[in-house]
Amino acid sequence: MRTILVSILAVLAVGCATPQTFNERLLAGYATVTETRQTAVTLVDAKKMSSADAVNVQQQADTARAGLDLARSMRASAPQQAEDKLTATQTIVRALRAYLLSKEAK
């Protein structure tokens, strides 16, 4: 799991194409939520995160997933609100990813 996360971060660091369109960013958000869930489990197995902490991460991932679902459902009727929701959700996902990276380093 760490290899996957490091690979993704390396790709982003060298300037490879980042998701640009709403749908690309939405898909990247879903993928990152899935990755976040898997990383939390891996960190618990490696004894780098407590079970209670992992439950909290999973709950935050649930919130992020709900935000992505809401952004997707709003896209046709309220495009600007959908963009705003997607941007806010991306912030949550980035914070979760940063938190998990800090746990991996310990």
Predicted regions and their residues:
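Cationic, hydrophobic amphipathic alpha-helical membrane-interacting segments
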Residues: 2-5, 10-106
